[in-house]
């Protein structure tokens, strides 16, 4: 029996890639860089590398947020204030929210039958802004953001801190749902939760990180609970 559902936000409920693309293009142009396909592609590689290092505990959040732009602009041979670029990017990202197909309706239906909790590794100010503009707060009992918790997914410390804040929490009645194997699914497994991987692109499952369920879109979750 499922009672507690932990949901990731980016690319689980909201289309982060679309919001990111728009915010990134605006920030780059403001600081003199044309957001060509090659520039955007290189940014995504650098960004992914930085977030993976955060998950492994090798970088702090500030080092990720500014470091990705510092590396990108250095590769482009341009001097810039990485902190200023970061502020511009996050300001634009915070006002962008685009729901994935069926996600809003699914969250609304689930909230009537289960206790929903948001579990995000995103930047607190950005995520709170997006949650507000998307009108998602009423559906969640609590919102857990790593920057405020003090630990990042997939660490057990992140999930343990979440569990401690939930009255009457029962681990065996909980499930973690998200699009990231290395963050959402690995974190859920480490913390003794059932896990559901949102995998719209049909990526291969890694043998060392095996979710209990795999779905292509969030509405499919309802049939598994």
Question: Over which residues does each language-model region extend?
Answer:
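Glycine-centered short loops/turns at secondary-structure junctions
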Residues: 113-114, 192
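Structured helix-beta-strand junction loops
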Residues: 46, 112-113, 139
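N-terminal helical cap/lid subdomain that shapes the substrate entry/recognition surface
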Residues: 2-101
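Catalytic-core regions built around general acid/base machinery
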Residues: 102-113
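Asp-based, Mg2+/Mn2+-dependent phosphohydrolase catalytic module
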Residues: 1-5, 17-18, 80, 108, ...
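Conserved phosphate-coupling serine/threonine residues in phosphotransfer and NTP-handling enzymes
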Residues: 120
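Conserved serine/cysteine hydrolase catalytic core
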Residues: 117
């Amino acid at each position: 029996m499922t009672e507690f559902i932990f949901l990731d936000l980016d690319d689980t409920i909201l289309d982060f890639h679309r919001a990111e693309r728009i915010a990134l293009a605006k920030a780059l142009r403001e600081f003199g860089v044309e957001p060509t396909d090659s520039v955007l592609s290189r940014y995504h590689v650098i960004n992914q590398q930085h977030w993976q290092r955060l998950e492994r505990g090798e970088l702090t959040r500030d080092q990720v947020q500014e470091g990705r732009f510092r590396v990108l602009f250095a590769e482009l041979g341009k001097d810039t204030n990485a902190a200023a670029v970061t502020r511009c990017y996050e300001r634009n990202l915070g006002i962008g929210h685009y729901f994935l197909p069926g996600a809003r309706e699914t969250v609304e239906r689930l909230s009537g039958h289960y206790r929903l909790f948001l579990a995000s590794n995103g930047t607190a100010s950005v995520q709170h802004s997006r949650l507000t503009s998307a009108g998602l707060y009423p559906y969640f009992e609590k919102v857990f953001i790593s920057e405020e918790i003090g630990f990042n997914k997939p660490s057990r410390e992140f999930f343990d801190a979440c569990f401690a804040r939930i009255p009457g929490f029962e681990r065996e009645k909980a499930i973690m749902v998200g699009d990231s194997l290395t963050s959402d699914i690995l974190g859920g497994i480490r913390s003794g939760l059932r896990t559901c991987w949102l995998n719209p692109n049909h990526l291969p499952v890694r043998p060392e990180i095996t979710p209990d369920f795999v779905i292509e879109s969030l509405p499919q979750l309802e049939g598994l609970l």
